[in-house]
Amino acid sequence: MSNTILQNLPKGQKVGIAFSGGLDTSAALLWMRQKGAVPYAYTANLGQPDEDDYNAIPKKAMAYGAENARLIDCRSQLAHEGIAAIQCGAFHISTGGIPYFNTTPLGRAVTGTMLVAAMKEDDVNIWGDGSTFKGNDIERFYRYGLLTNPNLKIYKPWLDVQFIEELGGRLEMSQFLIENGFDYKMSVEKAYSTDSNMLGATHEAKDLEQLSTGMKIVKPIMGVAFWDEKVEIKPETVTVTFEDGVPVALNGKHFDNAVDLILEANRIGGRHGLGMSDQIENRIIEAKSRGIYEAPGMALLHIAYERLVTGIHNEDTIEQYRINGIRLGRLLYQGRWFDPQALMLRETAQRWVAKAITGTVTLELRRGNDFTILNTESPNLTYEAERLSMEKVEDAPFDPVDRIGQLTMRNLDVSDTRGKLGIYAQTGLLSAIKDSVLPQLGKK
């Protein structure tokens, strides 16, 4: 068995812990200190919409026994990776045409690299976090951690039998903190769990594990419950502007900071409940899970970006963009966002697709994912209404005689296709009988 993963607490050694300030990591930090480890706490500021005071989290970690506690601002890098995902269409999960924007995998890519880099600065080479053995994050963090620090060792309290036996549940952890002089009150248990960052929110587990439980039990944290008729949502006209594949303006207001632009996109999309979806997905270990997702800003930017993609690029380029986007989305989901095969796909899309995406898209947002595209403007559009106008136009790009020639050339492949279908009929793969879908394949 690999010695990269430590199954017992490394006493007397520095142990970095990704500290959220919640019950699990608070109890784990205090427990590790009492058992003889030297815990260092690292908190990622990912612009979580449900976090009010980031500066209070490191102070809390120090109170629980951290040797040192640091707040790492990851927002700029997260915004950069989120925009890269949009440029590449790196989204492989969708239901009814509504994608999951891989917001949690993007957050893990940033957290896993930036926190471990901060640990290296403090000469901390053992890392722990709150991911469980059934989920995706345990593998994502493992990969990103070792990519950043090849000498890293992994210690997870939730894989330590002693920790589980002593503090195996929320009640036990809460009592442990109270017994040690901390006035800890458990939050009201929700019917599901939530994980979020600036790009989106994930709601899953507990009641949401039952497919008979719908989205309506979720209380959105990035927007409104658009399904509730009591919630007033007025139609809103929005413009989104891209330059060289990068979103730069919303409603005519230019942003020099990608973080500020994404936060404003969240506010705009959130007013309508845009980007919420209900997905069944395959986890890395191939078991299926179900999640309810929010990503109002990502959805808004994605809609505008794809509109420009279809108006600017040719059919084969769009096809490769979509196919490669699905492949890249899966690599991102698996924790391989910085692997060579992912970098190759990213480079292709960002260089040859995104660089041409300059323009402004005007939309009307209504409730949920209901929207209308009102206008598409770009100096790079290859869409020209005159080319296929049903009206008579001067200097038409082609005339009826040209089309006759083009259709005549089709005789070659139509003849080949008919021949192949005849072979299939002779071998029994297709039937040429009366009620067949291809009854005319007889030799007459």
Curated annotation (Swiss-Prot):
L-aspartate binds at residues 132, 136-137. It comes from Haemophilus influenzae (strain PittEE). Belongs to the argininosuccinate synthase family. Type 2 subfamily. GO terms for biological process: argininosuccinate metabolic process; L-arginine biosynthetic process; urea cycle. L-citrulline binds at residues 100, 136, 140, 193, 202, 204, 281. It comes from the Bacteria. The keyword Amino-acid biosynthesis applies. Its EC number is 6.3.4.5. One of its GO terms (cellular component) is cytoplasm. It is found in: Cytoplasm. GO terms for molecular function: argininosuccinate synthase activity; ATP binding; protein homodimerization activity. ATP binds at residues 18-26, 44, 130, 132, 137, 195. This is Argininosuccinate synthase. Pathway: Amino-acid biosynthesis; L-arginine biosynthesis; L-arginine from L-ornithine and carbamoyl phosphate: step 2/3.
